[in-house]
Amino acid sequence: CWELYWLEHGIQPDGMMPSDTTVGVGDDAFNTFFSETGAGKHVPRAVFVDLEPTVIDEVRTGAYRQLFHPEQLISGKEDAANNFARGHYTVGEEIVDLCLDRVRKLADNCTGL
């Protein structure tokens, strides 16, 4: 999904936009999904969370891995095996505070939430 967003907005895998690209400039929808770093990279406004680590590891090793800050990629050590109680009370409970903290940090950086 994110790869499609980058392609639609002309963002390269290193997060940079070619200088001749005007897609997204001044566009509120564009700024909803991406923020620009001090170095000019366009990075997603997202936190990825999964109790099962292999899914998040695909993002960590994928073509666009440079665009995700490691703090935005949160994974557990094991999945909940499709068991709500296990995900809510045991395995998931271990990372819920970390997830809430990361989402709070992203929300703090928003100008109009």
Swiss-Prot record:
Q: What domain of life?
A: Eukaryota
Mind telling me which InterPro entries this protein's record contains?
Answer: Alpha_tubulin, Tubulin, Tubulin/FtsZ_GTPase_sf, Tubulin_FtsZ_GTPase
Q: Which reaction does it catalyse?
A: GTP + H2O = GDP + phosphate + H(+)
Q: Which GO biological-process labels does this protein carry? A: microtubule-based process
Keyword tags: Cytoplasm, Cytoskeleton, GTP-binding, Hydrolase, Magnesium, Metal-binding, Microtubule, Nucleotide-binding
Cofactor(s) needed, names only, are: Mg(2+)
Record: residues binding GTP: E52
Cell compartment(s), UniProt:
Cytoplasm, Cytoskeleton
**Annotated EC:** 3.6.5.-
Binding-site residues for Mg(2+), renumbered to this chain:
E52
MF terms from GO for this chain are:
GTP binding; hydrolase activity; metal ion binding; structural constituent of cytoskeleton
Establish whether keyword Transport is in the entry: no
Provide the top EC class: hydrolase
Query: What are the GO cellular component annotations?
Result: cytoplasm; microtubule
State the function annotated in the UniProt record: Tubulin is the major constituent of microtubules, a cylinder consisting of laterally associated linear protofilaments composed of alpha- and beta-tubulin heterodimers. Microtubules grow by the addition of GTP-tubulin dimers to the microtubule end, where a stabilizing cap forms. Below the cap, tubulin dimers are in GDP-bound state, owing to GTPase activity of alpha-tubulin.
The record's note on quaternary structure and interaction partners says: Dimer of alpha and beta chains. A typical microtubule is a hollow water-filled tube with an outer diameter of 25 nm and an inner diameter of 15 nM. Alpha-beta heterodimers associate head-to-tail to form protofilaments running lengthwise along the microtubule wall with the beta-tubulin subunit facing the microtubule plus end conferring a structural polarity. Microtubules usually have 13 protofilaments but different protofilament numbers can be found in some organisms and specialized cells.
Family classification: Belongs to the tubulin family.
Q: What is this protein called?
A: Tubulin alpha chain
Q: Which organism is it from?
A: Picea abies
Q: What are the top taxonomic ranks of the organism?
A: Eukaryota, Viridiplantae, Streptophyta, Embryophyta, Tracheophyta
Gene for this chain? TUBA
